[in-house]
Structure formats: structure tokens, C-alpha cells
């Protein structure tokens, strides 16, 4: 990770704020901090996430500023809307600094036991590989499907629905899935977009948990369809149309794989 990026963020928010980089993607760098964006710190146990979009030197400066502002504001607005959906679990938005390209959110998840990594769905399923069909795995994967169903039923799409972008929060013996990273998210009622979301997640499961992926996706889709079916005839009709398009997306993906 670039020391220049870390230095720039420290200059923006002050040397007194401790920012720990935890990951870097093509568009943004993710930090954790114990400093709230605007409230005085009284404890030190709370942790927050700062998603920072650094300037892109390959873009014209004025275009880069405009794009960064647009994408940062767009993601923050989307998170704000998603928080209003009953039952949908996403990070709580705390602050948005569009001029510096950063979003502050609540921190979700924990480190899994025995150094198994962070509690996203990918690492959780790896941790449970010795008992892949246990009740807790089945319940968790079904709940993931319910969360995606809620997202899609309300006409929102994730845009990058991988097992790394589903964080699990422990609640006793259970794990509650939360959807994170809506940088590519959108408000869309197109079955094509929803079908692509499902296909991306199916491929992610197949690539990282190939031995059990078929069963996992079956459970996931049972949770997903239950959301639509709970809305009666209208839900059944929308589900039928979505699943038909999902099969078309699947077929296109297989053809691309065959052609290399």
C-alpha cells in the first residue's frame, strides 16, 4: 500500500487520528480508526471504517475531482437509503466528505478463531469446511440469500456481490450477514442487473468453495426466493421473471467460459 496515500489521509484528518490501513482496491483504500468523525472520543473500544478514494494521477485533475465527488456522494446516498429498508443489514453511515473522497462507517465483523481471517462469508465457509452442512452454516447461507432478496425486492443492486463483500456479525451462536461495499451499487429494477448480481455470487462460491458450492447456492436461493414469495402473487411473478433472466445470464457466462 502506498505510503503517499497513508500520508495524504493523515494530513487531511490530522496527525492525531490513528488510521490503520486494512485493504486496498482499484478505487479505494480502507482504513480503521477508533476516532469518531465528529463526536468526542470517550472510550477507545469503538472502531470505525474510513473508505478513502485517492486521486487518480492518470485522469485530468478536474475530471478526477468531479468523478471522486460524484462516486463518494453516490455511495453515501445509497447507504443512507439502504439503511431505511426494514430487515436489511448494511454498515451505518456516519459521515461523508465528498471533497476529500471519503466515507466514514461503522465497523462490522471480527477476527475468526485460530487465525482464520476476518469474518466475511468466504473465510467463514473456509473455517467450516470440516462441517460444511452443519445447521449454523445452512442458517447463515440462507440468511445471506434473504439479505440479497431484500436488496433486490426493493430494487437495489450491489454490483460486486462476492463472498468477501458479505460480512458476518456474531450474535450468540449465530452469524448475521451484512452486505458491504456499495461502490458499484445502484438503484435498479432491471432483472438483468439482479441476475448478474446472483451470477457473480454463484461464481464466487464456485471459485472459492467448489466442493460445496452447489449446496451453498441452493440454500442461498431458498432464502432469496422466500423474500419474493412472502409478497404473494406479485412476488411470485417478479421472481419468475428474475429467475428466467438469471438462467440467461448463466448461459451467457458459460458460453464465454467455453470460448475462453
From Swiss-Prot:
This protein is considered an atypical serine/threonine kinase, because it lacks the conventional structural elements necessary for the substrate recognition as well as a lysine residue that in all other serine/threonine kinases participates in the catalytic event. BUD32 has protein kinase activity in vitro, but in the context of the EKC/KEOPS complex, the catalytic subunit KAE1 switches the activity of BUD32 from kinase into ATPase. InterPro entries: Bud32 (IPR022495), Kinase-like_dom_sf (IPR011009), Prot_kinase_dom (IPR000719), Tyr_kinase_AS (IPR008266). This is EKC/KEOPS complex subunit BUD32. One of its GO terms (molecular function) is protein serine/threonine kinase activity. Keywords: Activator, ATP-binding, Chromosome, Cytoplasm, Hydrolase, Kinase, Nucleotide-binding, Nucleus, Phosphoprotein, Serine/threonine-protein kinase, Telomere, Transcription, Transcription regulation, Transferase, tRNA processing. It comes from the Eukaryota. The keyword tRNA processing applies. ATP binds at residues 22-30, 51. Its EC number is 3.6.-.-, 2.7.11.1. It is found in: Cytoplasm; Nucleus; Chromosome, Telomere. One of its GO terms (cellular component) is cytosol. NCBIfam families: arch_bud32.
Amino acid at each position: 500500500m502506498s505510503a503517499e496515500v497513508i500520508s495524504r489521509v493523515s494530513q487531511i484528518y490530522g496527525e492525531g487520528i490513528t488510521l490503520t490501513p486494512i485493504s486496498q482496491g482499484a478505487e479505494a483504500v480502507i482504513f480503521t480508526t477508533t476516532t469518531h468523525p465528529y463526536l468526542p472520543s470517550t472510550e477507545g473500544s469503538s472502531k470505525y471504517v474510513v473508505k478513502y478514494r485517492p486521486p487518480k494521477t492518470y485522469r485530468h485533475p478536474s475530471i478526477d475531482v468531479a468523478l471522486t465527488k460524484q462516486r463518494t456522494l453516490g455511495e453515501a446516498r445509497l447507504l443512507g437509503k439502504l439503511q431505511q429498508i426494514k430487515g436489511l443489514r448494511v454498515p451505518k453511515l456516519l459521515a461523508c466528505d465528498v471533497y476529500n473522497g471519503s466515507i466514514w462507517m461503522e465497523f462490522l465483523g471480527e477476527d475468526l478463531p485460530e487465525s482464520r481471517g476476518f469474518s466475511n462469508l468466504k473465510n467463514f465457509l473456509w473455517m467450516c469446511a470440516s462441517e460444511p452442512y452443519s445447521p449454523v452454516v445452512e442458517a447463515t447461507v440462507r440468511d445471506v440469500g434473504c439479505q440479497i432478496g431484500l436488496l433486490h425486492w426493493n430494487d437495489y443492486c450491489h454490483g460486486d456481490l462476492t463472498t468477501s463483500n458479505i460480512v458476518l456479525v456474531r450474535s450468540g451462536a449465530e452469524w448475521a450477514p451484512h452486505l458491504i461495499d456499495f461502490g458499484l451499487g445502484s438503484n435498479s429494477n432491471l432483472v438483468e442487473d439482479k441476475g448478474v448480481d446472483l451470477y457473480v455470487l454463484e461464481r464466487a462460491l464456485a471459485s472459492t468453495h467448489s466442493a460445496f458450492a452447489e449446496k451453498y447456492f441452493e440454500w442461498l436461493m431458498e432464502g432469496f426466493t422466500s423474500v419474493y414469495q412472502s409478497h404473494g402473487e406479485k412476488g411470485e411473478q417478479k421472481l419468475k421473471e428474475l429467475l428466467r433472466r438469471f438462467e440467461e445470464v448463466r448461459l451467457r457466462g458459460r458460453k464465454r467460459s467455453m470460448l475462453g
